[in-house]
Amino acid sequence: ITLGIIGIVAAITLPNLIANHKKQIIETRLAKFYSTVNQAITQSEVINGDKKYWFDDLGGAQIGEDGKPIEGSSEAQKWFNSYLAPYMQITKEEIDSSGRLIIYFPDGSAVKTRFSDGSREWIFYPEKPNNCSEATSNFGKCAFLFMYYPAKAPHGNGTENSDFKYHIGKGFEPFKWHWDGEATSLYDGCKERFSYTIEHAYCTALIQHNGWKIPKDYPIKL
């Protein structure tokens, strides 16, 4: 009977313990990445001047005839290594099969350019990227969207209109493109989508808005 009771208690409590541990990893590593990358930007500005002058929206590696990325051809990687890498602790860099840059950190997290033809949107992974599929349904679960767009880039196709008002002049920020400034919109844009955004695009911003803690009413099951 005693063993049976222990088994029942374990079956009830273990999933909660696992879920709470996962939440803690997400919260801690999101906050750490946000702090670390923006400190790196501040340090880089001391040497390179205002970030709006050295930011650029650059593409990833070119793909060769053999279908593999051409080593050394990623403009995004060259930019990152010039302006941010010297001020961050990095364990390794990779180029994925589509030419996108992936940066790995000592705590097991990583960040990757979302697109192969631009470097203003980034996906942060609290844990191994290989364990999190590319589907947008994973945004807010194991992948979290950021944008770095302090100014209109020389090589980008963006603007400085009101859609970017929560990014222009700032560092790496949770994705807030087209946000109307309302807290309820962050919730809606995390649960499904808000206006023109992709699904779950605002989950990172929702967590930031709650002091880098996952809200009790977080709309996505982790």
Model-derived segments and spans:
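Contiguous, often N-terminal, cationic amphipathic patches that form binding interfaces
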Residues: 1, 7, 41, 108-110, ...
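N-terminal single-pass transmembrane signal-anchor helix
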Residues: 1-22
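Membrane-proximal amphipathic alpha-helices
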Residues: 19-34
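Extracellular/luminal recognition modules and glycoprotein regions
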Residues: 25, 49-50, 66, 73
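Alpha-helix exit/C-cap motif
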Residues: 38-57
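Short, charge-patterned binding micro-sites
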Residues: 58-62
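Intrinsically disordered, low-complexity regions enriched in Pro/Ser/Thr/Gly and acidic residues
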Residues: 67-222
